[in-house]
């Protein structure tokens, strides 16, 4: 059975990607970061999110694979994205389809 957690910027599925389709899996989690391209990313920032995801998944090892636990992981990754935005590691994509500043209005350093 396919389980999923969807937040504004993080989507987690209990599935593998085969072609362009998600195939349910009991052993694989698939992470989709910023599916709406709201942020500008570099490889280092993406790797930081992936490492945190791996650490969180490992910390839940042995626990039930449930939508609740997937939501907890997704929520913790959202917190990381906010911290990265505030630290300047990522920035808003001004060419995004919709500018809604979901993590807060950009701050100018004076």
UniProtKB/Swiss-Prot annotation:
Name of the protein: NAD(P)H-quinone oxidoreductase subunit M
Source organism of this protein record: Synechococcus elongatus (strain ATCC 33912 / PCC 7942 / FACHB-805)
Family that this chain belongs to: Belongs to the complex I NdhM subunit family.
Subcellular location, record wording: Cellular thylakoid membrane
Keywords, comma-separated and alphabetical: Membrane, NAD, NADP, Plastoquinone, Quinone, Thylakoid, Translocase, Transport
A GO term from the CC aspect: plasma membrane-derived thylakoid membrane
Top EC group: translocase
GO function terms (MF aspect): oxidoreductase activity, acting on NAD(P)H, quinone or similar compound as acceptor; quinone binding
Record function comment: NDH-1 shuttles electrons from an unknown electron donor, via FMN and iron-sulfur (Fe-S) centers, to quinones in the respiratory and/or the photosynthetic chain. The immediate electron acceptor for the enzyme in this species is believed to be plastoquinone. Couples the redox reaction to proton translocation, and thus conserves the redox energy in a proton gradient. Cyanobacterial NDH-1 also plays a role in inorganic carbon-concentration.
Topology relative to the membrane: Peripheral membrane protein
The organism's taxonomic lineage, starting at the top: Bacteria, Bacillati, Cyanobacteriota, Cyanophyceae, Synechococcales
Catalytic activity: a plastoquinone + NADH + (n+1) H(+)(in) = a plastoquinol + NAD(+) + n H(+)(out); a plastoquinone + NADPH + (n+1) H(+)(in) = a plastoquinol + NADP(+) + n H(+)(out)
Subunit structure comment from the entry: NDH-1 can be composed of about 15 different subunits; different subcomplexes with different compositions have been identified which probably have different functions.
EC number(s) on file: 7.1.1.-
Domain of life the protein comes from: Bacteria
Main subcellular location of this protein, as a coarse class: membrane
KW Nucleotide-binding (keyword) present: no
């Amino acid at each position: 059975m396919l389980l999923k957690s969807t937040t504004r910027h993080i989507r987690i599925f209990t599935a593998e990607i085969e072609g362009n389709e998600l195939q349910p899996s009991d052993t694989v989690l698939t992470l989709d970061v910023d599916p709406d391209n709201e942020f500008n990313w570099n490889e280092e920032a993406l790797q930081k999110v992936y490492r945190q995801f791996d650490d969180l998944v490992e910390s839940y090892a042995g626990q039930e694979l449930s939508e609740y636990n997937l939501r907890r992981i997704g929520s913790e990754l959202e917190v990381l994205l906010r911290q990265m935005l505030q630290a300047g590691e990522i920035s808003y994509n001004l060419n995004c389809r919709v500018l809604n500043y979901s993590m807060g209005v950009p701050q100018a350093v004076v």
